[in-house]
Curated annotation (Swiss-Prot):
Its EC number is 3.6.1.31. It comes from Bacillus mycoides (strain KBAB4). One of its GO terms (molecular function) is ATP binding. Keywords: Amino-acid biosynthesis, ATP-binding, Cytoplasm, Histidine biosynthesis, Hydrolase, Nucleotide-binding. This is Phosphoribosyl-ATP pyrophosphatase. It is found in: Cytoplasm. GO terms for biological process: L-histidine biosynthetic process. It catalyses: 1-(5-phospho-beta-D-ribosyl)-ATP + H2O = 1-(5-phospho-beta-D-ribosyl)-5'-AMP + diphosphate + H(+).
Length: 107
């Protein structure tokens, strides 16, 4: 699984280094961080709607869009995917208590 995510991220980085005129990825880079963040917000909202509709197929599709746009943000910020994967590895297996987390007041 990690390999396909790595390939996606590498493709995004390649588009950043070597733009293609008709590339949606390059469109996002050309519009900048605010556009990328807006798309992440839109895609997260679509995940929520798909989940509320109990539409598993749509949840999967929208999650892929979230991953993609988050990867574009990482590339925009020059944050290597390896940094994120290392954080996942460090968090994996750690015990977490509900009391350790801040209460969510509003949505």
């Amino acid at each position: 699984m990690e390999d396909i995510l790595k390939l996606l991220f590498e493709t995004i980085e390649e588009r950043k280094k070597n733009p293609l005129s008709e590339s949606y990825t390059n469109y996002l880079f050309s519009k900048g961080e605010d556009k990328i963040l807006k798309k992440i917000g839109e895609e997260c909202t679509e995940v929520i709607i798909a989940s509320k509709n109990n539409d598993k197929e749509e949840i999967v599709k929208e999650m892929v869009d979230v991953f993609y746009h988050c990867f574009v943000l990482l590339a925009e910020k020059n944050i290597p995917l390896e940094d994120v994967m290392q954080e996942v590895k460090e968090r994996n297996g750690k015990l977490s208590r509900v009391g350790d987390r801040r209460e969510i007041d509003t949505l």
